[in-house]
Amino acid sequence: MKFAVIQFPGSNCDLDMLHAIRDSLGEEAEYVWHAETSLEGFDAVLLPGGFSYGDYLRTGAIAKFSSIMPEVLRFAETGKPVLGVCNGFQILTEIGLLPGALIRNNNLHFICKTVPLRVVNGNTIFTGLYEDNEVIHVPVAHGEGNYYCDDETLLKLKENNQIVFTYDSVNPNGSRADIAGIVNERGNVLGMMPHPERAVEDIIGGTDGLRLFQSIVQAWKEEQVNA
C-alpha cells in the first residue's frame, strides 16, 4: 500500500507521518509537495500537522487554495482513505470534506500532552482494529483544536455515527460533545486533532496510534481481495 504525505509550507509533522508509515507500519510512503497536481499511484492520502502557511488568516485557510487540493477532493470522491491530523483536520474542514470548524482552545493556550480517547465508532476503515468504547492514549499538540459545529450538524454527526473519537474523562480544549475525530458520511475521510503518528512505538510512550494505520492497511487489503 502506498501513502501520500502532503507537504505544505509550515508543515512540521510530515516527517513523523512518513516515519510512522515506513518504519513502524512497513508500508510505502512519499512526500507530495503542495504545488503538485497529481496523486496518481497512491492508495491513501495523509494531511499532517503543523502550521501550513504560518496559520495566517486562520488555520488551513490558505492551504485550501494549494494546487494539490482539487486532487485531494477528487481522491476522496473515489472512496479512497484520506486522513487529516491536527492542521490536516483543520484543512479538511476548510475544503468542505468534513463539517464544522476548529477554533481556539477554550483556555486560549497551546496544549501539548497525551490524552485518553474513547473509540466511539470501531466500524470504520480507520478503526477496524479497535474495540468500540475502547480507551486509548494519544498525544495532542494544538492551539486551535476546539471543534465547533451548530446543533443541526452535531445531531447529524450523531445520527450518522460519524463521531469516531471523543476525549475521555477530560476535554482539553472545549470541543463540542468532547469530539476529537470525525469521518465524512461515506466513512473514507477522517479528521482528528490527536496525533496517532506520535503513538506508534513503545519507546516514545505507546503504540495506540499504530492500530489506526494498521486498520487502513487491513481495509485496503480486504478491498483488494474482494475486487
Curated annotation (Swiss-Prot):
The active site is at 86 (nucleophile), 195, 197. The keyword Transport does not apply. One of its GO terms (cellular component) is cytoplasm. Residues 2-226 form the Glutamine amidotransferase type-1 domain. SUPFAM superfamilies: Class I glutamine amidotransferase-like (SSF52317). Pathway: Purine metabolism; IMP biosynthesis via de novo pathway; 5-amino-1-(5-phospho-D-ribosyl)imidazole from N(2)-formyl-N(1)-(5-phospho-D-ribosyl)glycinamide: step 1/2. Gene3D superfamilies: 3.40.50.880. GO terms for biological process: 'de novo' IMP biosynthetic process. It catalyses: N(2)-formyl-N(1)-(5-phospho-beta-D-ribosyl)glycinamide + L-glutamine + ATP + H2O = 2-formamido-N(1)-(5-O-phospho-beta-D-ribosyl)acetamidine + L-glutamate + ADP + phosphate + H(+); L-glutamine + H2O = L-glutamate + NH4(+). GO terms for molecular function: ATP binding; glutaminase activity; phosphoribosylformylglycinamidine synthase activity. The keyword Iron-sulfur does not apply. Its EC number is 6.3.5.3, 3.5.1.2. It is found in: Cytoplasm. Keywords: ATP-binding, Cytoplasm, Glutamine amidotransferase, Hydrolase, Ligase, Nucleotide-binding, Purine biosynthesis. It comes from the Bacteria. Part of the phosphoribosylformylglycinamidine synthase complex involved in the purines biosynthetic pathway. Catalyzes the ATP-dependent conversion of formylglycinamide ribonucleotide (FGAR) and glutamine to yield formylglycinamidine ribonucleotide (FGAM) and glutamate. The FGAM synthase complex is composed of three subunits. PurQ produces an ammonia molecule by converting glutamine to glutamate. PurL transfers the ammonia molecule to FGAR to form FGAM in an ATP-dependent manner. Part of the FGAM synthase complex composed of 1 PurL, 1 PurQ and 2 PurS subunits. This is Phosphoribosylformylglycinamidine synthase subunit PurQ. It comes from Listeria welshimeri serovar 6b (strain ATCC 35897 / DSM 20650 / CCUG 15529 / CIP 8149 / NCTC 11857 / SLCC 5334 / V8).
